[in-house]
A protein has these predicted regions:
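Carbohydrate-interacting/catalytic domains
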Residues: 1-219
Length: 219
């Protein structure tokens, strides 16, 4: 470690800034960086949705750092203290309230899918307080089949099931015989309104939105 928050090395930090400024003037470097990043973008966005769903459904209170309602590419302090465009977020929330998942997914670049999902989950937490209370315990669920390790799922209490994909960069669209057995009852995906029971195949579950939260019908 050549520099730190408590013991900064000004000369070293200035040399780093000069180096970064220099490479960013190179069209060849920019082109190679874009080629490197491009295949990471969509898997990264899906991971962001998965992490957000998990933190909003597991026991405890979800924490949101300012600005992370949309995609956030900042580093740790002080980089993550950039000004936040709250007017933009307020406008997107107003737009998102009435739109279906398909419309939210039509605007990936703005981060609308993440804000849309977050708004839905916050409303759900308000409507179904008992399902998110300390009495609703975490229970892991295990998938079956070829890609069982690429599904992360858990039950929250009796009425909620969260399901997200893992390792999506190398998965492609092929889930093969992978399925997730479900507890008894009829379950509705709160993002797409798809209704399932007994078991569900990830390829079907994630067809309308990249992650899923199932709610027991009639509960």
């Amino acid at each position: 470690m050549n520099t730190s928050w408590h013991e900064p090395n000004q000369a070293y930090e200035e040399s780093i800034r000069s180096f970064v400024d220099g490479v960013l003037q190179s069209p060849e470097f920019i082109a190679s960086l874009e080629r490197f990043v491009e295949p990471l973008v969509q898997p990264g966005r899906i991971n962001s949705l998965a992490q957000t769903l998990i933190k909003m459904v597991v026991p405890g209170l979800p924490d949101f750092y300012q600005g992370t309602e949309l995609w956030d590419l900042s580093l740790v302090d002080p980089d993550n203290r950039r000004p936040v465009d709250f007017a933009l977020r307020a406008d997107l929330v107003r737009r998102a309230r009435a739109m279906p998942a398909s419309e939210a997914l039509s605007d990936w670049d703005s981060g609308l899918p993440k804000l849309w999902m977050t708004a839905r989950l916050l409303a759900l937490r308000r409507e179904r307080e008992a399902d998110f209370s300390g009495q609703s315990k975490y229970q892991p669920l295990v998938a079956q089949g070829t890609h069982l390790g690429r599904v992360f799922a858990f039950r929250r209490g009796e009425n909620l099931i969260a399901v997200v994909p893992r390792f999506t960069m190398t998965l492609g669209a092929e889930w093969g015989d992978t399925c997730l057995p479900l507890p008894g009852g009829v379950w509705r995906n709160c993002f797409t309104d798809t209704v399932v029971e007994r078991e569900v195949r990830p390829g079907t579950l994630f067809e309308g939105f990249p992650v899923a939260l199932l709610i027991r019908e009639g509960a």
